Amino acid sequence: PALSHLSLKASYSLTADRGPSYVTNSLAVIKASTPWRPTSGDTETGLKVSSLENAQLTYEKKHELNLGLDVGFVNNRINLAFDWYKRNNFDLIGTVTTQGIGGEISKYGNVAEMKSQGVELSLFTRNIERKDFKWQTNFIFAWMDNEVTKLKTMTRMIDYITGTGYSMEGTPRGSLFSLKFKGLNEMGIPTFLAADGSITSTNIQFQETVNMSNLVYEGPVDPTITGSLGNIFKWKGFTLNVFMTYSFGNVVRLDPIFSNGYSDLTAMPREFANRYLNPGDERRTNVPVIASTRQNNDISNLYVAYSAYNYSDVRVAKGDFIRMKEISLSYDFPQSVSSKLRMSGLSLKFQATNPFLIYSDKKLQGQDPEFFNTGGVAVPMPKQFTLTLRVSF
């Protein structure tokens, strides 16, 4: 039959969660302590307030609607699973700055609301099924979108632009913002749009919490589209598996490598080959000059210009990628061969894991977008090549 099976599912829920594990409960937390005394013989037990009462703190809550479809066609040679969800989160917990009433300037509170929706799709097909040849395909696609609809916090400009991802009302959770780069001046010093609308090199207030009209929204730091595509081909005793993964929709902050001063021990990246060198170069390049001692003496706070350049819109790349995740080729020897060797089974397999990237942003200059900015002690995603001989008796 054309339609093999069909099932529909739907659910709606209201759930509550205690929030982050590091957030204390709404009651005061009082713990025993041993106050310091000059001599060990004068010790005594006391009590200390570990956390003040936070009576207005309540659970994080979420309304969620889920709709799903699972259908099969042509004797289940084609199987499709589709799920859609919509969520409304409210009373989300975060830090809030207060007037100091109650003894704390900053404390945890229910400060945010967020709406989100997403789609998850899985498609499995048996494309060809013959005696000596088979071909199967498995395709997975996931899309998500969210928006912070209410937020009562005071966040500094520096937090929005560093690249870790901060939330602003009207944008996705974990968004990246940048200073607007306005080109190099005649000396090769970078210039930017200031909050008052003027063009400046050093009048950038990284600790600003109110007027941030000069920031440019770049996008979320988390991908909005993820998935995979796998194909398995079988011909007689051979099996070829080709598996790819993909991710789109996020942005990454390039490494903050520029400074108003360098030492002989500084490793210069390849961007410096295209830097400003002579008057007029500001018309051909966006890479600032290596500031001289005289420029550092004549221009006060010159370090601000280079810090701002690190966090400008020209230092942002797309985090999109398509990766060849795995390629494997195996061969199962015929029973006639293994029986002659007094074996019940014999197979040989070659497998390559993470062999190469099919696509990534050229701004990353070959760096892995999945590994980018994960930290200096993080281990990059390794390339693995294995050859396996399997023998059974």
Predicted stretch roles:
Residues 248-346:
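Extracytoplasmic gating/loop element in the C-terminal half of outer-membrane beta-barrel translocons
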